[in-house]
């Protein structure tokens, strides 16, 4: 950086000097003859050459009419380079005649300039090379720190600490930067399919004696939690036990713990009971926008299409409240029925405990049959010793789920045939972005999968609330083409709504979790009018100048005219008609029936099964198994390679993202939902049509 600045300064000074000498060369003979010009030029150069800016020398030039000149060198001997240059001027005065003075000076200057430039560039090049290799060495060292050698004991307990990882759609490599910043402890994302495979492997592994689970702090989507619990339930069928220990149970954590053979709880008071039932919070910010002088104009089709409602109302519409109540009740019925069945009680009894707040103290949990025994940690260790058949707790060897998954989730490279799993996770957006479901990028991925002859079946894993209609159309077009060559099976995660349903409605078979949120077959467009805020709050007046009558239609400085509203409404209606027709074709039902269950309404997977929007309640594992069996000559998933697209981040990519990534300043605060609400403005291009489910839905 210092060398670069020095180079720039030197170039500027040399250019300025040459410019001044050009002027000097054009003076009249009265002001400077050939010899006089030489002396003056040499003097100028001496004065300019002091790169150290230290006035330790002076050069006095005297002009003699007798065609002689000399340089009075007073104190300049201290500067050897200047002495050399000035001597050159005096000894070769005949050469520097007229304009040749300038050429000679330029030649000398350029030699010095070139030498300095080359030296500087060489230094920069060497520095760049060293920095490049040093950076990669550091990244490699940090990546190595993030890796550890996993060793499987001869006999072990599979330890599942739900607070140490989060269930995600795809596994990603551990980011060592996170570990460094967090002081050595991080929450690792583990893909749901990898987690399920690990549990399945443990069921058949004679080295794994039982599962010890700490369910508190469980994180993941509702569908991911549901799939994980099903895998635990299947583990029990192997005859091996699951024991859980909880201190502060919540909805998701107790839902997981309830599958256990035994549930132990701390006897100590003071822990907060978060097991109170599910809740969906709807946020409305119209009053806030009114105070800011912002008016949002919403054009939509579907009485249940509540996306954007938060901007135009201060409370929920009747239809939106209806669908949210039914959605939360359906989700809770799924969880409550499984909890009740596992604990040998009725759902009515369970709901009564929660409604009457009967689970206040640890003893209440035992009395109501939700916990088997209260144990302090020493007593818990003895229980684990008894199950492991060990004399002391130090002999109870364990391996974490994430480490065990690393050992067991290996690719079957011997298999020549592949099942591709395309993970459509996040908002559906236009362009080629690496995050979310970018239309151009995913169309390219699907096209590549179609052209890969080793891929003989495809699972489309959808975990998206929808988004851009244009991007959805691009993705669906490629999927339709893919279906002409290979079977495409859909698997729904937490969301497969609106645009998420658009891209998957024509799949050969659709699996959905009971807690999946799907449907939301509707369309909307949204235009904010910020003219009032600009004029009244910022005191800025904007006057449009248009070539045509509606040139400023999307200028945001005025409300739409009735004619413009009709124009946009016609576009929304046209897209809605296309949406219902493609659902009719994909699901084999009349358009009129599709319209009845559409209207933008959100359905849970359990309800979607009854109305024909999905084919079967099942997990990602079920969809992959079905896809494998659809391949000729394949008897099961063990005979194929399962490959995921897009490829997950590498350690290096995760490190770079850590350095350049963004953070949510509202995360974990009461304002997080409001921050997300304002963030919705940035997700929509003005005037575009979107197929997206209602915005901020938080289920706890």
Report residues per predicted region:
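Polybasic, low-complexity intrinsically disordered segments
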Residues: 3-9, 13-65
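Short, Lys/Arg-enriched N-terminal segments with co-localized hydrophobic residues
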Residues: 72-109
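Short hydrophobic helices that act as membrane-entry/anchoring signals
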Residues: 103, 107, 111-126, 672, ...
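N-terminal type II signal-anchor transmembrane helix
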Residues: 111-151, 155
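Cleft-lining beta-strand/loop regions that shape enzyme active-site pockets
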Residues: 149-151, 156-283, 411-533
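Charged, glycine-interspersed solvent-exposed loop segments at helix/strand-loop junctions
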Residues: 286-385, 531-611, 615-631, 635-637
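Extracytoplasmic and endomembrane cell-envelope/extracellular-matrix remodeling and assembly machinery
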Residues: 380-421, 475
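Intrinsic disorder and flexible/low-complexity segments
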Residues: 414-419, 423-454, 645-700
């Amino acid at each position: 950086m210092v060398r670069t600045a020095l180079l720039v300064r030197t170039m500027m000074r040399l250019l300025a000097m040459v410019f001044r000498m050009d002027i000097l060369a054009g003076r009249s003979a009265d002001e400077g003859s050939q010899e006089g010009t030489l002396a003056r030029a040499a003097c100028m150069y001496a004065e300019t050459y002091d790169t150290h800016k230290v006035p330790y020398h002076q050069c006095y030039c005297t002009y003699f009419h007798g065609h002689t000149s000399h340089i009075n060198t007073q104190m300049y001997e201290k500067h050897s380079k200047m002495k050399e240059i000035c001597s050159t001027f005096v000894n070769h005065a005949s050469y520097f005649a007229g304009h040749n003075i300038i050429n000679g000076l330029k030649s000398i200057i350029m030699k010095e300039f070139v030498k300095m430039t080359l030296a500087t560039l060489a230094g920069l090049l060497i520095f760049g090379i060293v920095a490049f290799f040093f950076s990669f060495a550091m990244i490699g060292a940090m990546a190595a720190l993030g890796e550890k050698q996993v060793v499987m004991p001869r006999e072990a307990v599979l330890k599942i600490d739900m607070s140490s990882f989060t269930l995600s759609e795809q596994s990603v490599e551990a980011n060592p930067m996170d570990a460094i910043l967090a002081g050595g402890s991080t929450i690792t994302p583990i893909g749901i399919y990898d987690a399920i495979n690990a549990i399945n492997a443990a069921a058949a592994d004679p080295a794994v004696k039982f599962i010890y689970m700490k369910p508190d702090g469980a994180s993941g989507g509702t569908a991911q939690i549901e799939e994980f619990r099903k895998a635990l339930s299947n583990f029990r069928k192997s005859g091996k036990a699951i024991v859980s220990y909880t201190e502060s149970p919540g909805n998701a954590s107790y839902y997981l713990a309830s599958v256990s053979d035994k549930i132990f709880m701390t006897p100590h008071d003071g822990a907060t009971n978060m097991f109170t039932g599910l809740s969906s919070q709807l946020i409305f910010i119209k009053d806030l926008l009114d105070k800011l002088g912002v008016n949002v104009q919403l054009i939509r089709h579907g009485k249940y299409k509540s996306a954007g409602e938060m901007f135009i109302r201060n409370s929920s519409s009747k239809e939106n409240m209806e669908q949210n109540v039914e959605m939360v009740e359906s989700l809770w019925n799924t969880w409550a029925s499984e909890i009740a069945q596992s604990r040998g009680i009725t759902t009515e009894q369970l709901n009564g405990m929660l409604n009457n707040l009967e689970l206040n103290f640890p003893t209440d949990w035992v009395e109501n049959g939700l916990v088997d025994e209260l144990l302090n940690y020493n007593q818990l260790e003895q229980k684990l010793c008894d199950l492991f058949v060990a004399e002391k707790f130090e002999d109870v060897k364990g391996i974490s789920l994430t480490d065990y998954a690393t050992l067991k989730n290996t690719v079957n490279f011997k298999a020549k045939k592949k099942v591709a799993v395309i993970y459509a996770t996040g908002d559906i957006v236009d362009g080629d972005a690496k995050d979310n479901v970018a239309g151009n990028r995913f169309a390219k991925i699907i096209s590549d999968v179609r052209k890969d002859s080793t891929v003989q079946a495809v699972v489309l894993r959808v975990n998206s609330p929808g988004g851009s209609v244009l991007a959805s159309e691009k993705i669906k077009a490629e999927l339709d083409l893919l279906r002409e060559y290979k079977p495409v099976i859909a698997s729904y995660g937490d969301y497969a709504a609106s645009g998420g349903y658009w891209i998957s409605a024509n799949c050969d078979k659709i699996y959905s979790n009971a807690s999946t949120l799907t449907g939301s077959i509707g369309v909307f467009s949204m235009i904010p009018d910020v003219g009032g805020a600009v004029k009244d709050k910022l005191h800025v007046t904007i006057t449009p100048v248009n070539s045509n009558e509606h040139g400023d239609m999307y200028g945001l400085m005025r409300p739409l005219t009735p004619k413009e509203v009709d124009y946009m409404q016609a576009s929304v209606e046209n897209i809605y008609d296309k949406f219902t027709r493609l659902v009719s074709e994909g699901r084999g039902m009349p358009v009129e029936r599709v319209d009845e269950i559409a209207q933008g309404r959100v359905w849970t997977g359990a309800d979607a099964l009854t109305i024909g929007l999905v084919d079967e309640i099942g997990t990602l594992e079920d969809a992959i198994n079905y896809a494998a069996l659809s391949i000729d000559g394949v008897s099961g998933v063990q005979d194929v390679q399962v490959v995921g697209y897009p490829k997950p981040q590498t350690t290096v990519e995760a490190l770079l993202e850590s350095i350049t990534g963004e953070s949510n300043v509202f995360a974990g605060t009461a304002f997080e939902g409001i921050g997300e609400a304002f963030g919705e403005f940035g997700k929509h291009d003005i005037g575009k049509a979107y197929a997206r489910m209602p915005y901020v839905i938080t289920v706890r």
